[in-house]
Amino acid sequence: MMEIPEFTFHVVESADYEEVLHLFWDHFMPWEPATRLTGSCTKLGYRIYNLNSMLRKMLQNNTCWMAKSQHNEIVGVIFCTKITKDDMPSKLPTKSEYIHQGWPTDFTLVMLLLDELCDHQKLLCDNKVNLMLDLFALVVKTNFRGQGLATQLIKETIKNAQTMGVPLVSISCSSAFTQRCSIKLGFSENKTILYKNWHCDGQKIANVEDIDPIHQAAVSYYKVINL
């Protein structure tokens, strides 16, 4: 007798946009290590307008996938975005430019960290490809963690990238848990930034005593897909 899989995976449809955005803000942001270290607001119900709009655009581009339990409950989601060489700006925004765009001042530090962590233009050039899928955020509902769902979501996304003809995927992980999933699935390390060495404009961002001993660094990875 065939076993029924514990989770099923689906592209996020418009009817589920609000629920997966709720998952991101209430089951991811309050625990996201880099955001916490900047002192950026992570209280339940708080949303950063620009980031919410960015996630919504990813959803509208059909590059986000969700996991459902046997009871049809949405228990995880992975937000992704397709990146081409032509999409890349010639110069990444500075802190003041991010602020001018409407990003909260403290959260610009997280944006700058992500920019430093993964140079998508260089990654495309180094791997001699014109298209990649960036795994922007991986969310697992708090009461479903520790069941291997994060690894399954990344694995499913790699499979979907292959189906779409995308030759390269990247992921930037601020959490040690996602880093372990990436290594397990054969991703190659791209760049590591230890939180104790995280600086912006010559200023140290994180106090050593505030750094979680489990999550000590942000790491970016990439994986070449065999099409």
Q: Where are these predicted regions, by residue range?
A:
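Helix-loop element at the rim of GNAT/NAT acetyltransferase active sites that forms part
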Residues: 22-41, 84-88
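Conserved acetyl-CoA-binding loop-helix of GNAT-fold acetyltransferases
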Residues: 135-140, 145-159
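A short beta-loop-alpha structural element at the N-terminal edge
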Residues: 8-22
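A short helix-loop-beta-strand connector motif used in the catalytic cores of GNAT acetyltransferases and
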Residues: 5, 50-66, 76, 83-88, ...
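Conserved acyl-donor/pantetheine-binding loop and adjacent beta-alpha core of acyl/acetyltransferases
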Residues: 35, 74-137, 191-214
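Active-site rim helix/loop that mediates acceptor-substrate recognition in acyltransferases
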Residues: 34-64, 69, 79, 122-123
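Conserved GNAT acetyl-CoA-binding A-motif
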Residues: 133, 161-174
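Conserved active-site alpha-helix within GNAT-family acetyltransferase domains
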Residues: 162-163, 175-199
